[in-house]
């Protein structure tokens, strides 16, 4: 009679279970060896008993190399397929982060412009006030520095204009000195004659325009013989001093 069909279930008898494990383990190791030799295949077999004892077989010289090869073949494709998904997930997280930062900056800008201040509490309002004060101080400082720079430029331009004016004045004085020197050396007699004539006319003008010493209390329309005599005497004296000739209406 042949062997009956063995039911595949856990052997409850401990001794029978250990005997069956030893027989089948040796048969499995033998089959792995035969497969590697007959088919020139790289075979690795790892067995752990129920007590945790290790049994292994490897057709190559190093079990770790076979395990690395198995890991690359089994999980490498999964990592390659999951790489775009991971990159997409990371990109989406970065997008959410940048979006939140952008919305926060927009909210801060509106708050600086005095908008959307209702949701802010007292602490946030104080912080916003300090931020505005700092910005205002910085703007004033930059404005003051700009005005000081402009003032310095204007002072430099003023100094340059003063130096230019001083140089032109010195040049003008030199030109006047040279001209006076030439005139004094070539036309002495003509210059003296012009001076005498100018003095003569000046004396006449001063004599003609001397004030008349009349009584200021005299009224218009009343003849005063004393004042008339004084006017006549003064006019005759001035005419004699001027050219020695007395007009007929004065006689």
UniProtKB/Swiss-Prot annotation:
MADS-box domain segment(s): 3-57
Subunit structure and binding partners: Heterodimer with AGAMOUS capable of binding to CArG-box sequences. Interacts with AGL16. Interacts with TT16/AGL32.
Domain K-box residue range list: 88-178
Cited function: Probable transcription factor. Functions with SEPALLATA2/AGL4 and SEPALLATA3/AGL9 to ensure proper development of petals, stamens and carpels, and to prevent the indeterminate growth of the flower meristem. Forms a heterodimer via the K-box domain with AGAMOUS, that could be involved in genes regulation during floral meristem development.
Cellular component terms per the entry's GO annotation: nucleus
Primary subcellular site in the record, as a coarse category: nucleus
InterPro entries found in the cross-reference section: MADS-box/MEF2_TF (IPR050142), MEF2-like_N (IPR033896), TF_Kbox (IPR002487), TF_MADSbox (IPR002100), TF_MADSbox_sf (IPR036879)
SUPFAM superfamilies with a match to the protein in the record: SRF-like
Native source species: Arabidopsis thaliana (Mouse-ear cress)
GO annotation terms (biological process): cell differentiation; flower development; positive regulation of transcription by RNA polymerase II
Keyword terms, alphabetized: Activator, Coiled coil, Developmental protein, Differentiation, DNA-binding, Flowering, Nucleus, Transcription, Transcription regulation
Disruption phenotype: Triple mutations in the SEP1, SEP2 and SEP3 genes result in the replacement of the stamens and petals by sepals and of the carpels by a new mutant flower with sepaloid organs.
Gene: SEP1
Subcellular location: Nucleus
Tissue-level expression: Expressed mainly in carpels, and weakly in stamens.
Protein name in UniProt: Developmental protein SEPALLATA 1
Record bears the keyword Membrane: no
One GO molecular-function entry: protein dimerization activity
PROSITE patterns: K_BOX (PS51297), MADS_BOX_1 (PS00350), MADS_BOX_2 (PS50066)
Record Pfam families: K-box (PF01486), SRF-TF (PF00319)
Coiled coil ranges: 85-176
């Amino acid at each position: 009679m042949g062997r009956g069909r063995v039911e595949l279930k856990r052997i409850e008898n401990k001794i029978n279970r250990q005997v069956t494990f030893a027989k089948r383990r040796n048969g499995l190791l033998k089959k792995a060896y035969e497969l590697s030799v007959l088919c020139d295949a790289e075979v690795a077999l790892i067995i752990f008993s129920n007590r945790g004892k290790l049994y292994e077989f490897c057709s190559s010289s190093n079990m770790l190399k076979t395990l690395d090869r198995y890991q690359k073949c089994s999980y490498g494709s999964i990592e390659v397929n999951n790489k775009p998904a991971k990159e997409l997930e990371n990109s989406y997280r970065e997008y959410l982060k940048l979006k939140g930062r952008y919305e926060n900056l927009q909210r801060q800008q509106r708050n600086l412009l005095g908008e959307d201040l209702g949701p802010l509490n007292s602490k946030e309002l104080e912080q916003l006030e300090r931020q505005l004060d700092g910005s205002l101080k910085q703007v004033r400082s930059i404005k003051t520095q700009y005005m000081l720079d402009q003032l310095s430029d204007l002072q430099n331009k003023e100094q340059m204009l003063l130096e230019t004016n001083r140089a032109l004045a010195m040049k003008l004085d030199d030109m006047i000195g040279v001209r006076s020197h030439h005139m004094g050396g070539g036309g002495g007699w003509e210059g003296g004659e012009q001076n005498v004539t100018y003095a003569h006319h000046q004396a006449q003008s001063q004599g003609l325009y001397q004030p008349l010493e009349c009584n200021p209390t005299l009224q218009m329309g009343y003849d005063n013989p004393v004042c008339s005599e004084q006017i006549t005497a003064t006019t005759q004296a001035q005419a004699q001093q001027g050219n020695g000739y007395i007009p007929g209406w004065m006689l």
